[in-house]
């Protein structure tokens, strides 16, 4: 029996964890195995090869850590940098704030570039810092690709353009937790040195895998890194890669089989089709928000996210009450506003293995909730705006043509 049972399917529309597809659930429904047997290394080898495809890299080296995105952050930092190293890090929302907190606690010299919440990274400030850094004291640029607290997406290619323009050797470390497998991400083309994601986001798996991919330049940086690391030491993994056994400690067998199934689904749909689907869902959600007479927390079109929409509420309405009522009355999970935007926004997650009709159900629920809390929404307005757009843009399902 569920701890808090509700009839029918629960509607999960937070920006992670996300819905898990049935084939993935079935793939994970298995007993434990001996990870030292030939089967698990053989499985792991194919996973590592295929994970590179979702990062769009041919030269990167992937690592599958039994952890969350927070552990993946730590792995990226401690394997490439030394205590006291200067980092330029962008603060644009709650999750970039948490990464910066981790950087400081790991004793890096963090040069914080802060923007108003709802804005993207201030690249003009970065350009100024790079132009003045003739001695190359900046060792890394840390940036969150998609900030789920505010629904803001940063332009990673523009960061690489600045680094190249100033011929600066700083490493580019990118949090792609809520973007990889949902938004356009090109590790090799954009010159990303370390990219990372988490299994519970667009991969549509349970929480528990922190997936990190390192460029050859990042691997070279491990030779001079003096940060203390044990659990997240890339060199331990690389040693077992060479042995062909792949695991320095016990992996989650069930998550590995789940990852295999998740990647198979991604390749069946096609990564570019998945990116296009997320673009449709994001556009439909924004049209609904506009029809309701509400505003997006994201302040410019160039920063909009196609994986999450943070919806601003009027001052007399508490965004957390919308989230509470969604769960209590409608069996719907929406995202809370966090930190500076707590109570000021609620968030609609539209990432992972989710389709257009599922989204329309969520939007219908939000309309009822808005009416419940006293907002004068015109019932059906957002659903009509979204469905009119989607009806003209949903493609045929390739496997059913």
Curated annotation (Swiss-Prot):
Its EC number is 2.6.1.45, 2.6.1.44, 2.6.1.-, 2.6.1.51. A motif (Microbody targeting signal) lies at residues 399-401. It catalyses: glyoxylate + L-serine = 3-hydroxypyruvate + glycine; glyoxylate + L-alanine = glycine + pyruvate; L-serine + pyruvate = 3-hydroxypyruvate + L-alanine; 3-hydroxypyruvate + L-asparagine = 2-oxosuccinamate + L-serine. InterPro entries: Aminotrans_V_dom (IPR000192), Aminotrans_V_PyrdxlP_BS (IPR020578), PyrdxlP-dep_Trfase (IPR015424), PyrdxlP-dep_Trfase_major (IPR015421), PyrdxlP-dep_Trfase_small (IPR015422), SP_NH2Trfase/AEP_transaminase (IPR024169). Pfam families: Aminotran_5. Its cofactor is pyridoxal 5'-phosphate. Pyridoxal 5'-phosphate binds at residues 68-70, 148, 200-201. Its main location: other. One of its GO terms (molecular function) is mRNA binding. It is found in: Peroxisome. 3-hydroxypyruvate binds at residues 201, 347. Optimum pH is 9.2. The modification N-acetylmethionine is found at residue 1. Induction: Up-regulated in roots after treatment with asparagine. Induced in roots by infection with the soil-born fungal pathogen Verticillium longisporum. Induced in roots by abscicic acid (ABA) and salt stress. The modification Phosphoserine is found at residue 204. PROSITE patterns: AA_TRANSFER_CLASS_5 (PS00595). SUPFAM superfamilies: PLP-dependent transferases. One of its GO terms (biological process) is photorespiration. The keyword Transferase applies. Disruption phenotype: No visible phenotype under normal growth conditions. Preferentially acts as a serine--glyoxylate aminotransferase in vitro. Seedlings overexpressing AGT1 exhibit increased length of primary roots, increased number of lateral roots and increased tolerance to salt stress. Photorespiratory enzyme that catalyzes transamination reactions with multiple substrates, including asparagine. Functions exclusively as a catabolic enzyme in Asn metabolism. Involved in root development during seedling establishment after seed germination by regulating serine homeostasis and acetate conversion. Forms homodimers. Interacts with RABGAP22. This is Serine--glyoxylate aminotransferase. It comes from Arabidopsis thaliana (Mouse-ear cress).
